[in-house]
């Protein structure tokens, strides 16, 4: 479980997904998949049509989630996934955040 893993072994991926990724269940599929993998973080729609997400957890599992983002749920058409790696913040749970205005 990520909560029992030393902080030094955790990573944080900040992801921006471009394509037909809004209105296709991308956020809720992200929550389901990330939660099943035991990751923490959040996901939200952006006004420019992209989806933004943050995943924190053990490196291999975070990388699995980033790979999942390249396909997303069945109705999504992903064109690009940009990933920035940052210092983990020790997030708890996984949630959908409100749209950024």
UniProtKB/Swiss-Prot annotation:
<dbReference type="InterPro" id="IPR017968">
    <property type="entry name" value="Acylphosphatase_CS"/>
</dbReference>
<protein>
    <recommendedName>
        <fullName>Acylphosphatase</fullName>
        <ecNumber>3.6.1.7</ecNumber>
    </recommendedName>
</protein>
<feature type="active site">
    <location>
        <position position="27"/>
    </location>
</feature>
<feature type="active site">
    <location>
        <position position="45"/>
    </location>
</feature>
<dbReference type="GO" id="GO:0003998">
    <property type="term" value="F:acylphosphatase activity"/>
</dbReference>
<dbReference type="Pfam" id="PF00708">
    <property type="entry name" value="Acylphosphatase"/>
</dbReference>
<dbReference type="InterPro" id="IPR020456">
    <property type="entry name" value="Acylphosphatase"/>
</dbReference>
<dbReference type="InterPro" id="IPR036046">
    <property type="entry name" value="Acylphosphatase-like_dom_sf"/>
</dbReference>
<comment type="similarity">
    <text>Belongs to the acylphosphatase family.</text>
</comment>
<keyword id="KW-0378">Hydrolase</keyword>
<feature type="domain" description="Acylphosphatase-like">
    <location>
        <begin position="12"/>
        <end position="98"/>
    </location>
</feature>
<dbReference type="InterPro" id="IPR001792">
    <property type="entry name" value="Acylphosphatase-like_dom"/>
</dbReference>
